[in-house]
């Protein structure tokens, strides 16, 4: 039985991967009177006077909404709200299993930016945080920014920032292995959607100076056509040398490649044209931009992918559960750039110098230390 066949069989068996479990058991009239009427009126009255009391008396303190419109689901594309449910349920499972955070999947049957924003604002009182998921670019940028302005709870688009944080963590350790540094390293980010933009922004914040972004048409620069508003903003802070040409042109003399794009678009010749001991994060799924063995044979020193069957898996699950765990425990109102940097450094620190090598630059998703270390890094900045 293949993995896909087993997944379908198990989803049919589960009929949903999460369920509601009661903390308060109702086994008597007294239990009923305390959990519901008349006793439930007391916490209601307290919250009515002080909305912060909701963190003490309700699930708000440890619950996030996983919100999607189904417009950019995995490699499946715009499959809509209902078809996105298995992914959002899975995300809720990961929140609970890896971070101890309760999560509710909410798939919205609209792809209108204003309707999504209004809906999330209206449901926000029930939650301590909002995790945006699988919303297409460039709409995802506006939706997140507007919600951050409107709400007093953390709003986090994991496709952007979770990916960026883990990529930075991996690069921090890969530079230790290769002896490269952020000031001199030339970085190429291929893919200018939500993940590519967020990765580039975080690398710039960390201190990288030489970053070139590419899309399906090649190098992105001031003369590029058909850029969306966010890509136009990125032109102002990337490709400062004014390069033009193809991805192959961009990779000549580069030190680091980050791919969030399409399968098999990087050749061995391209890798060979990069600087010595190149770092490649080829994260297209399920087939990366170049297979690790081919990249290594062409001269790459460190290669990461999004897959669990290769070394150096770049997996968001080492980031988002701990980030929200820390944000909720610390009652953060937002997740800042400083928190993202601290999280990346914390994740990188989990691989000791003795353990660090070209095939081991990131902690395993099942490392029990991860969520607590990440949550502490977040809470220290609240």
Which stretches of residues belong to each language-model region?
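Solvent-exposed alpha-helices and their adjacent loops that cap or buttress functional pockets
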Residues: 12, 55-60, 96-97, 122-124, ...
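Glycine-rich phosphate/diphosphate-binding loop of Rossmann-like nucleotide-binding domains
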Residues: 74, 81-99, 157, 165-262
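Rossmann-like adenosine-cofactor binding region
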Residues: 232-302, 307-309
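Adenosine-phosphate binding glycine-rich loop
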Residues: 158, 282-382
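Short, ordered loop/turn segments at secondary-structure junctions
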Residues: 69-71, 79, 108-109, 134-137, ...
